Amino acid sequence: MKVFMIGGTGLLGSEAAKCLIEKGHEVETLSLPSLPKGAEFPKEMKIVFGDINKMTDAEIEAQLKGVDVFVFAAGVDERVECPAPVEAFYYKYNIAPLERVFSACKRVGVKKAVVLGSYFAYLTKVRPDLQADSKHKYIRSRVLQEMVCENFADEDFAVCVLELPYIFGTQKGRKPVWTILIEQIEFMDKFPFTMYPKGGTAMLTCRQVGQVIAGACEKEYKGFNAVPIGMYNMKWDKFLSVVYKARGMDPQIKIVGVPAWMMQMGMVKAVKDYKKRGIASGVNPMQLPHIMNYDLFIDNKYAIELGATEDDINSAIEDSIRVSVAAYEGKAELLGMLGEE
């Protein structure tokens, strides 16, 4: 099987490439020119440097000829800060490439696509009462992304969206997206306790994501499929204990679960900061507490069905946090996301 990826040199794409190559498949990826310093990629993976947003339709078609599966392992999430209008930013990186590549896929006969999506789209299905897609522009963009995938899917072109939760693990030379968490919680270090929402989240490691992507490439899908993915469900208080341990702090620091209205009071500072810096947030800070007070958990059966195996999630969290702290403190020269996951 020949697989063409966008984002194969990113944290998640490179893990998928490793798994696919180990399974005997051929992998080629389109990558932005800047590669993380020291990162290792499978020598069997062919890397083509370029920007999908600057390629012609003919160039895209040439890349897709003879390909069995297209994997979109690129894009940006809600933790990437961007200027207004945020809707245009998300469209450029998360949706527009799919519209162009899917059209080319159908013209040259590619039969399947696997897209790395977000579990926030899954949230809108299990908790429509939260109205997350109307209150948060990032979540709306992920719902629109799935709509585009569904519109292109048919009996001759299958599309599988992997609704991914929070992911932990590191890639040498690349800046983790978790630096934003360090910024958010550092001010509470001086207190004898930490106030945080009562909810929790699904999660998995980057290695497990690679396994799931490879499994989705191999699985026989028909039409459109959206699959919620997660291997572990963790409450926020337990998660923060692991974070504190990674930061060299006492993991037994008391963590007090607070209601949404109380967290909203703390978000006023974030709103003012965004406004001062001209940043448009894809997630409404004043509405986020309602999501974080919910246990956004996922049954791991879907990930296991696609080949995910056990991993050490606590170690992956600790690795992510240690590198994030180094980046936040300016002690490491790391490459940002650049639209690749």
Stretches with model-predicted labels:
Residues 96-140, 160:
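Conserved Rossmann-fold NAD(P)-dependent oxidoreductase catalytic core, especially the SDR/UDP-sugar
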Residues 240-296:
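Terminal hydrophobic/aromatic helix or amphipathic segment near a protein terminus
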Residues 294-341:
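Amphipathic terminal alpha-helices
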Residues 148-173:
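Conserved beta-loop-beta element that borders a ligand/cofactor-binding pocket
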Residues 169-182, 216-227, 249-251:
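Glycine/proline-rich active-site loop of Rossmann-fold NAD(P)-dependent oxidoreductases
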Residues 183-204:
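A conserved pocket-lining segment of Rossmann-fold NAD(P)-dependent short-chain dehydrogenase/reductase
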Residues 3-23:
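N-terminal Rossmann NAD(P)H-binding glycine-rich loop of SDR-like oxidoreductase domains
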Residues 46-96, 100:
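NAD(P)H-binding glycine-rich loop region in Rossmannoid oxidoreductase-like domains
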